[in-house]
Amino acid sequence: MRRGSVLPAWGALATVLLRARALLAQAETAPTPAAEAQPFDWEWLKGQARELARQPFTPLGEDRPPQLQALTWDQYNAIRFRPDHALWVGTDLAFQIQFFHLGIFYRHAVQIYQVDDGQARRIAYDPAMFDYGPNKFDPPLPPDLGFAGFRVHFHEDFRQDVAVFEGASYFRATDRDSQYGMSCRGLAVDTGLSRPEEFPVFTRFWLVRPRPSDTVLTVYALLEGESATGAYRFGVAPGGITVMDVDALVIARKPIERIGLAPLTSMYQFGENDPIPDSSTTVGPGPSPWTSRWRR
């Protein structure tokens, strides 16, 4: 992933532009809000982020109905996306998209759009997309529930993940051996201070329908938080090592004491031994294919 730098500048609204450059600027007038089959491009999304920065922050509500709030980890994991319902399945495109269900600690629904020929249309949640396993919901789940996020699959093996966008502003990717690297966040705010850190959230995504010859998937995202808003553009290029090229415009709503751009995160079990991050350890028989991976 490419990281940018922050250059100090005057103004109450700080605008950070990643991909080897950054600047601070005041918010500008934005285009009208998104609607069904509305024209979409990068400039429009940046305008949305600027307009949101001019408005008071509205905390995100609880999108999980009680039935999903009560799920255990095993019950939630029993909810599986049906691959035959993937976005772009049955086409000659190199990518497919599968969606994640709300539940357990995924409490905020994200809006996901497909962009085709510059027109954005929202992808509707449909319970038929999912196999709920032994789970039975009474009353039935709402028909407009929404998604928790999505994962990207590539034509070399549609069964394997390439990248995942799910939870707050988290995203991550795999290599050709399906080993996930460290997770990344779109933005970190006030980490390591005496007060709790702030977690800005990707609330909307736009997936650009690729051409049959495309081997890079373009994903856009809108970030919302109490202290900042942002517009993000991801170029996801699968391969031996998956490469993500990221452009981001981040606008501060108020002064931020500590800001982290493209922060990397991992985890390890605390104990007497030296910490071994779960994102970088693999176990295999040598040069032959991997047989197992230590995750946690």
Model-derived regions: residue spans:
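Low-complexity, acidic Ser/Thr/Pro/Gly-rich terminal tails and inter-domain linkers that flank the onset
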Residues: G225-R233
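Short, solvent-exposed beta-strand/turn "edge" segments of beta-rich domains on protein surfaces
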Residues: H101-G103, G235-I241
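Beta-strand/loop-rich accessory regions of lumenal/periplasmic or secreted enzymes
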Residues: P134-D214, L222-G225, D247-R296
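C-terminal segment of N-terminal export signals and the immediately downstream linker at the start
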Residues: L17-T58
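Solvent-exposed N-terminal domain segments of exported/luminal and surface proteins
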Residues: A53-L193
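N-terminal export signals
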Residues: M1-A25
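Short, solvent-exposed loop/turn and secondary-structure capping segments
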Residues: A124-D126, Y232, R258-A262
